[in-house]
């Protein structure tokens, strides 16, 4: 599985020389959302690679009607305009992208769960401070919306043109849904980054060098005080840091 190999290599690179990774473990096994990242991310990588291969073929194809063959002086009416190859893969891509958000939200949930030495909700004062609780709510809402958006558009069809166009791909609907899934997923991942940085502020041990640099850069350049700033602003800061630099 090429995607799994890629995902595992990324994790090894990120955690290289981490002070936390080699620490003694009390738990026999981690939850799937941590332990199975290479398998889940890898499957999405492979799915997206397939989708891109189909899109590349489509970009280099004749997708019009009629088809004109200049050398043969022939014009043939056909169906190359039909967008089924795009519709199916756009739906598939939405499912693949949504899985990044699905597993990310589970990790965010565990980060605020008050386990493994971290305070509940990563709150500074338990009982009077809701910490990152609302951030996890937002991630859960994004993931839930993605599930609705991943209902395939390509299984739908409606008749038009007086019955002449009696099977259509709905590829445009699949494309607009994919764009929304991508945006939701980017926000869910930004919430995980924000939550992870809040957790790192609690820890004394350092993670891998490159990740530690990014963590330090983010917390030093942004006010992460959730008690004085709206959570929306913190999430927006994280989104901009992750995706718009």
Model-derived regions, located:
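C-terminal auxiliary extensions adjacent to catalytic cores
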Residues: 1-245
